Amino acid sequence: MATIVDQAKAQMAKSVESTKENFSGIRTGRANPALLNGITVDYYGAPTPLKAVATIGVPEPRTLAVTPFDASQANAVEKALRDSDLGASPRRDGNVIRLTMPELTEERRKEYVKIAKGKAEDGKVAVRNIRRKAKESLDKAIKDGDMGEDEGDRLLKELDKVTKQTTDELDALLETKQKEIMEV
């Protein structure tokens, strides 16, 4: 029956990873290739993720360099970057498209912090749902006689401990992200 807690722990770890991934798409003062994850390019008529049609590098702290694999698609890549809501205008430099990230205003930083808080809360909701399902499984096992009350109580305490550790980890991630965003 400890497998119920182990499964919950694994699912909570996935939730933390998902939250980290979501955080990587939120802009900070620095250029980060993950900012371009949601951008799709009209590649020969088919919407294709940018990272599938170009390499993305960070030559300078506030600059992203996007190099299409196929030079003939540079215009399509540039158009996709221009149409995105990054707030940066692409500059062509031969086959390389450079995106210089503008400094974030205080208002925009606060907006990004708000988005980060929302994503962290989504992660916490997922963790609470995982805990609830695991608790229901433990309660059912006790009711069906598959485990004793004492064993169930011990596993529930372990589940609560794992849940608290995970929510604390999400809080720490949020705090770190907030500092990154507010850093001038």
UniProtKB/Swiss-Prot annotation:
GO cellular component: cytoplasm
Compartment annotation: Cytoplasm
GO process terms (BP): translational termination
GO-annotated molecular function: ribosomal large subunit binding
Keywords assigned by UniProt, alphabetized: Cytoplasm, Protein biosynthesis
UniProt keyword Repeat, yes or no: no
Chief localisation class: cytoplasm
InterPro entries recorded: Ribosome_recyc_fac (IPR002661), Ribosome_recyc_fac_dom (IPR023584), RRF_sf (IPR036191)
Function: Responsible for the release of ribosomes from messenger RNA at the termination of protein biosynthesis. May increase the efficiency of translation by recycling ribosomes from one round of translation to another.
Protein family: Belongs to the RRF family.
PANTHER family to which the protein is assigned, alphabetical: MITOCHONDRIAL RIBOSOME RECYCLING FACTOR PSEUDO 1, RIBOSOME RECYCLING FACTOR
Listed name of the protein: Ribosome-recycling factor
Species of provenance: Bifidobacterium adolescentis (strain ATCC 15703 / DSM 20083 / NCTC 11814 / E194a)
